[in-house]
């Protein structure tokens, strides 16, 4: 099921993930490289109603799609509870593009952004 949000995340093509993740960013000292860690607790993508294999995480907005294949499932007491995805950028244009997605995703989901001091 696709929503009318301007920015969304999908693990299965055409199916928006309704669970909003915790997102943590880290960057190199010069700011050119870094990563975004997405942590989804009990995402719909792991529920029994979803079928198929998760092959990546798609970040979709009005500019297009950013894809990462770095996706892991974390189990607690034998149950899949967390989905963890990592997006790595290797240059400033990739970081700028990611931040435009992140800002759009935040607005679509009523979220804010704060820097660690």
Swiss-Prot record:
GO biological process annotation, one example: photosynthesis
Gene3D superfamilies: Photosystem II Psb28
Membrane topology: Peripheral membrane protein
Locations listed in the record: Cellular thylakoid membrane
UniProt keywords, alphabetically: Membrane, Photosynthesis, Photosystem II, Thylakoid
Principal location listed in the UniProt entry: membrane
GO cellular component term, pick one: photosystem II oxygen evolving complex
Homology family: Belongs to the Psb28 family.
Quaternary assembly: Part of the photosystem II complex.
Protein name in UniProt: Photosystem II reaction center Psb28 protein
Organism encoding this protein: Prochlorococcus marinus (strain MIT 9301)
